């Protein structure tokens, strides 16, 4: 039987049923993520196209195009000070002209919400990951964080 890739509803909405998109949660770790390490994620609870892999904690672009990504979670660290997470594209930090780092300041107790989004132009086979920045911090997981992305066009 044929695969339906695009459906237009009676009121004009375009439904792209096979359009690449994913959402996953931060894998809970009761210890700190070391500086400059990749943030681990759980199996995706949305993974249309199967383009997110929890085996290597990355999204791989199935086609050339513009992709939007969003990341958020609660973060704590020992003592007060700044911390950041950052987007990686093909193994290198995607900052500067692309936007990049997600910063916050920790008071020394409790949790802070860290979030950010980015739009990247990707070629087929390019991959995107989220990394912890230059400080050892604890990324909360399970019910508290999410990494998601989708093909915009």
Residue ranges and their predicted role:
Residues 1-2:
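Short, small/polar residue-rich loop motifs at catalytic or cofactor-binding pockets
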Residues 5, 9-153:
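Extracellular jelly-roll beta-sandwich "head" domains, especially the C-terminal globular C1q domain
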